[in-house]
Amino acid sequence: MPTLSIVKGIKVYINWDDHLPPHFHAMFAGHDVSIDIETMEPKGDFPKRQLRIILGWAECHRDELLDNWNLIAANEMHYEISPEL
């Protein structure tokens, strides 16, 4: 599971060989959420404050998230994304 960024203590990653639609995962304090890159719809249990943070960050970095999704799906090298909001 390649780590793309760590945003205010929230680990952002995409799993190898993951299912469609394109999405990423965020992990914080034992909680894990999957977020659709296109719709930004979250699935999973995640603290509300951290969910707001990661959704705001993802909106700013949507193109980079999708680019990384495509790279990882093609088994190519991904790149890190800035944690800046």
Segments predicted by a language model, with ranges:
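A short, structured beta-strand/loop element
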Residues: 15-48
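Short, charged/polar N-terminal "headpieces" of proteins
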Residues: 1-20
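Generic structural signal for residues positioned in beta-strands
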Residues: 11-13, 34, 80
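Short, charged low-complexity linear motifs
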Residues: 8-11, 43-47, 51-55
